[in-house]
């Protein structure tokens, strides 16, 4: 009987436009940021769903892996990509991006202004031209227009040699309230040191480990600055010994929990602004 009276009073309160006590209100689901480290074998593909709904894609693996990324995004009902980022010119990063552009509408495009051009990068540039997309320069200090999120490139901080394409990597720092992420592309020790010297914002709870866990990156000095709680290595079967025990040990000594796409498959990190959950 009491429950029935309470329901009647609640209905009258709503009709009359009266405020409903907080104890009676149904809490709306808090916005989250979701980062999908898509398993594309030996290479990178990262999809970010921003709290306000924007879709961001960083790389799409090697040529042929674009289809994997497209299928994954379509399962999530992604209709367009607000921001696409090519971290640098390596084939295992940009190789799959043309296929994504040919299947899903892309609204804006960013890439570092490297002097190095690979066949995969040329294909990426040509596809962008066909789609009438202007490639905006990704470099330290450039901010991305994402609502409710501070997304800013922290690298590259300088120019590098023509053959030094890994250090040209667009390094992106993303912060949603207390959730922090650092996406490193294939930036190596030289670029890491340059970012540290430039005093860029590198501290992040979630670190995308550079170059599939190569010993040429993820130095102890860099990890000590980033202080990651979680480290994701996007890696597949390879002949390079990736990830190296040196890199994995450096991360574990820093008390970071390590996830690998060759073992864990696609890794999804969800942040609610204060904490994280990790799943598939």
PLM features per residue range, with description:
Residues 2-280:
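Non-globular, low-confidence helical/coil segments that flank catalytic cores
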């Amino acid at each position: 009987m009491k429950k029935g009276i309470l329901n009647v009073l609640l209905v009258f309160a709503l009709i009359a436009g009266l405020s409903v006590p907080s104890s009676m209100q149904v809490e709306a689901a808090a916005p989250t940021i979701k980062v999908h480290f898509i398993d594309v074998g030996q290479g990178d593909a990262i999809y970010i769903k921003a709290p306000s709904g924007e879709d961001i894609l960083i790389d799409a693996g090697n040529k042929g892996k674009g289809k994997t990324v497209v299928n994954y995004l379509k399962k999530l009902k992604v209709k367009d990509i607000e921001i696409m980022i090519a971290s640098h010119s390596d084939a295992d990063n940009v190789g799959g991006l043309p296929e994504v552009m040919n299947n899903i509408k892309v609204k804006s495009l960013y890439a570092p202004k490297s002097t190095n051009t690979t066949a995969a990068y040329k294909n990426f540039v040509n596809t962008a031209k066909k789609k009438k997309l202007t490639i905006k320069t990704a470099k330290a200090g450039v901010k991305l227009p994402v609502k409710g999120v501070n997304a800013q490139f922290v690298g590259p901080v300088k120019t590098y040699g023509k053959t030094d394409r890994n250090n040209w990597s667009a390094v992106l720092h993303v912060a949603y309230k207390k959730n922090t992420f650092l996406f490193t592309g294939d930036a190596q020790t030289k670029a890491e040191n340059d970012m540290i010297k430039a005093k860029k914002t590198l501290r992040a709870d979630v670190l995308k480990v550079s170059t599939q866990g190569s010993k040429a990156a993820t130095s102890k000095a860099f990890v000590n600055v980033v202080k990651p709680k979680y480290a994701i290595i996007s890696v597949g079967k390879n002949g390079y010994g990736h990830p190296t025990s040196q890199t994995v040990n450096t991360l574990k000594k820093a008390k970071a929990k390590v996830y690998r796409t060759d073992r864990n498959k696609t890794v999804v990190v969800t942040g609610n602004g204060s904490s994280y959950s990790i799943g598939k």
